[in-house]
């Protein structure tokens, strides 16, 4: 099975402006995708609202994957997302992910917990801001 990973998915969603939001989402997430971030569930539409909001704030960044595990349809990782915002400020979030992959290799469900490593108090909810 060919499968996506968090680095490819987040890079396409946040940093690859050659892809529309829908193109990036369709590449990495199923139509019935759901996500739980720090205890708050979002369906695919709510998740895409969140990413659309981030695209208005973010000018660049990178995703560093420190651990990553695939086991059949299960996926887990620990990564740090480094973001540079349009105002020049930076945010770094460490994220712990557990996910289910669909048979086609796209994310079907993600549950994640975030820890801000760098940024202002206003950025603490950047992982779920809409």
Features from the language model and the residues they span:
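Residue-level detector of alpha-helical secondary structure
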Residues: 24-28, 46-53
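A beta-strand edge to alpha-helix "cap/lid" segment located at domain peripheries
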Residues: 9, 15, 48, 52-130
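Short acidic-aromatic low-complexity motifs
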Residues: 1-32
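Residues at or immediately preceding the N-termini of alpha-helices
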Residues: 21-22, 44, 104
């Amino acid at each position: 099975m060919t499968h996506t990973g968090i680095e490819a998915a987040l890079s396409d969603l946040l940093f690859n402006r050659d892809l529309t939001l829908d193109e990036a989402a369709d590449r990495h997430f199923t139509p019935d995708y759901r996500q739980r971030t720090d205890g708050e569930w979002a369906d695919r539409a709510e998740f895409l609202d969140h990413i659309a909001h981030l695209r208005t704030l973010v000018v660049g960044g990178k995703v560093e994957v420190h651990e990553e595990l695939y086991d059949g349809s299960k996926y887990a990782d620990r990564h740090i997302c480094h973001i540079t915002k349009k105002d020049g400020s930076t945010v770094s979030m460490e994220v712990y992910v557990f996910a289910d992959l669909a048979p086609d290799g796209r994310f079907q469900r993600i549950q994640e917990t975030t820890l801000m490593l760098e940024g202002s108090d206003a950025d603490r909810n950047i992982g779920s801001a809409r």
